[in-house]
């Protein structure tokens, strides 16, 4: 079994790459693929670049060239739900776009025409994650949260951005810039997927400062959770 793991930035894939004893690097169209093993599993680790288009290009190349049987997305996210703290982990059971509006043609806000309104994380992987992280976080000051993640091609930090997202997605847990695009490609290639991200900021007016300060913490937390999951696959 080959498992695809995707992060947008070097900071989000570096720790995982460093656990691979032997790495083959392949660069296609600016996307960096690292082929090797993590936790005894065959892995293709992708540094896709930031944003929905980069994520979609990279995920498509991953699916077409490397044929993964599972895709997992790692990295950071901005927390939107009450009670979330930096270092908490969000496992997405659903994803949607926060900046797509074709409602005039009868689609749900966030829905790309002829695509689902929401992309569902794989039920089997979600169940595994729930079991693993219940034990993993029982001794931690942080926690794992499950729910809706919204993807935008914007860094969310202003009140008006919050208001728009909450208007259409009142149960949103976190926001970021790639996951729904990854999910859409996985859906179109019929590949089971799971999104696991750690909170680097609270998507507020201090978000840029928090992100710069805590991106490495979030990357470490997310990478650790993915390694724990890989041990069970």
UniProtKB/Swiss-Prot annotation:
Major enzyme class: hydrolase
Any one GO biological process: L-methionine salvage from methylthioadenosine
Enzyme Commission identifier(s): 3.2.2.9
Catalytic residues in the record: 12 (proton acceptor), 201 (proton donor)
Catalytic activity as recorded in UniProt: S-adenosyl-L-homocysteine + H2O = S-(5-deoxy-D-ribos-5-yl)-L-homocysteine + adenine; S-methyl-5'-thioadenosine + H2O = 5-(methylsulfanyl)-D-ribose + adenine; 5'-deoxyadenosine + H2O = 5-deoxy-D-ribose + adenine
Gene Ontology terms for molecular function: adenosylhomocysteine nucleosidase activity; methylthioadenosine nucleosidase activity
Pathway: Amino-acid biosynthesis; L-methionine biosynthesis via salvage pathway; S-methyl-5-thio-alpha-D-ribose 1-phosphate from S-methyl-5'-thioadenosine (hydrolase route): step 1/2
A Gene Ontology term for the protein's cellular component: cytosol
Alphabetic keyword roster: Amino-acid biosynthesis, Hydrolase, Methionine biosynthesis
Family annotation (SUPFAM superfamilies): Purine and uridine phosphorylases (SSF53167)
One Pfam family per UniProt: PNP_UDP_1
UniProt keyword Amino-acid biosynthesis, yes or no: yes
Family stated for the protein in its record: Belongs to the PNP/UDP phosphorylase family. MtnN subfamily.
Stated role: Catalyzes the irreversible cleavage of the glycosidic bond in both 5'-methylthioadenosine (MTA) and S-adenosylhomocysteine (SAH/AdoHcy) to adenine and the corresponding thioribose, 5'-methylthioribose and S-ribosylhomocysteine, respectively. Also cleaves 5'-deoxyadenosine, a toxic by-product of radical S-adenosylmethionine (SAM) enzymes, into 5-deoxyribose and adenine.
Protein name as catalogued: 5'-methylthioadenosine/S-adenosylhomocysteine nucleosidase
Organism of origin: Listeria welshimeri serovar 6b (strain ATCC 35897 / DSM 20650 / CCUG 15529 / CIP 8149 / NCTC 11857 / SLCC 5334 / V8)
Gene responsible for this protein: mtnN
């Amino acid at each position: 079994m080959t498992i695809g793991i995707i992060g947008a930035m070097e900071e989000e894939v570096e720790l995982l790459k460093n656990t691979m004893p032997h790495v083959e690097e392949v660069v296609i169209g600016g996307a960096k693929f690292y082929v090797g093993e993590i936790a005894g599993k065959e892995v293709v680790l992708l540094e896709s670049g930031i944003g929905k288009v980069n994520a979609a290009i990279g995920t498509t190349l991953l699916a077409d060239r490397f044929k993964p049987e599972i895709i997992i997305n790692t990295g950071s996210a901005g927390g939107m739900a009450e009670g979330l703290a930096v270092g908490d982990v969000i496992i997405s059971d659903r994803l949607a776009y926060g900046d797509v509006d074709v409602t005039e043609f009868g689609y749900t806000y966030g829905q790309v025409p002829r695509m689902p309104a929401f992309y569902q994380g794989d039920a089997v992987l979600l169940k595994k994650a729930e079991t693993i992280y219940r034990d993993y976080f029982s001794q931690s000051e942080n926690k794992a949260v499950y729910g809706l993640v919204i993807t935008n091609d914007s860094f969310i930090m202003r009140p008006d951005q919050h208001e728009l997202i909450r208007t259409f997605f009142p149960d949103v847990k976190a926001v970021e810039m790639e996951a729904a695009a990854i999910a859409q490609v996985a859906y179109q290639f019929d590949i089971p997927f799971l999104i696991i991200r750690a909170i680097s900021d609270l998507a507020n007016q201090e978000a840029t400062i928090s992100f710069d300060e805590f991106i490495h913490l979030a990357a470490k937390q997310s990478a650790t959770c993915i390694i724990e999951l890989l041990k069970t696959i």
